[in-house]
Amino acid sequence: MDLSGSLLIAMPSMADPRFERSLVLICAHSPDGAMGLVINKPVEDLSFAGMLEQLNIPRAPNGRDIRVHLGGPMERGRGFVLHSPDYMSVGATMLVSGKFGMTATVDILEALARGQGPSSALMALGYSGWGPGQLEAEVQRNDWLTAEAPSELVFSDDDPGKWTGMLRHMGIDPLTLSSTAGHA
């Protein structure tokens, strides 16, 4: 099962508090493991403009302002921009299932600071990673639901409402979710 481009929706049974009510877009998945970005946990004390300032990247008056998220517990000092596929940095952008791009180089930050770049984007500090078979085991254990990732929800500014919104998009009332998995 290749979950690249899928959205993981944390179930109430999620044992790891870092992923409680999280949505994770899986950017890469293979027999060697998986890598994804949490898309609904903003970093409250860091703005995109503040990050550009720290990196000495000048921001034009029409420069873009995108939300900065905590992408996961791995390498929190490393930044990733998840974006619409209308922007490609040669040799640096990874296309995710044809629906998203992920770029981790300074050129996309400079483009956004100039008011250019992709039409939709969010910044993630760090990432979520799984070793071989680990994600599959978590899905089987009922830690995560998986679904196709709607672009409009991924790039929505309503971070607190994304988890509930995704469940409702799937036809699931969040109040009916159980924290225990059944076995048929």
Curated annotation (Swiss-Prot):
User: Domain of life here?
Assistant: Bacteria
Q: Where are the transmembrane segments?
A: none
Instruction: Name a GO CC annotation attached to this entry.
Output: cytosol
Q: What SUPFAM superfamilies does this protein map onto?
A: VC0467-like
Which Pfam families does the record match to this protein?
DUF179
Write down the InterPro entries for this protein, in alphabetical order.
AlgH-like (IPR003774)
Q: Which family does it belong to?
A: Belongs to the UPF0301 (AlgH) family.
Q: Which HAMAP family match?
A: UPF0301
Q: What is this protein called?
A: UPF0301 protein Rsph17029_2659
Q: Which organism is it from?
A: Cereibacter sphaeroides (strain ATCC 17029 / ATH 2.4.9) (Rhodobacter sphaeroides)
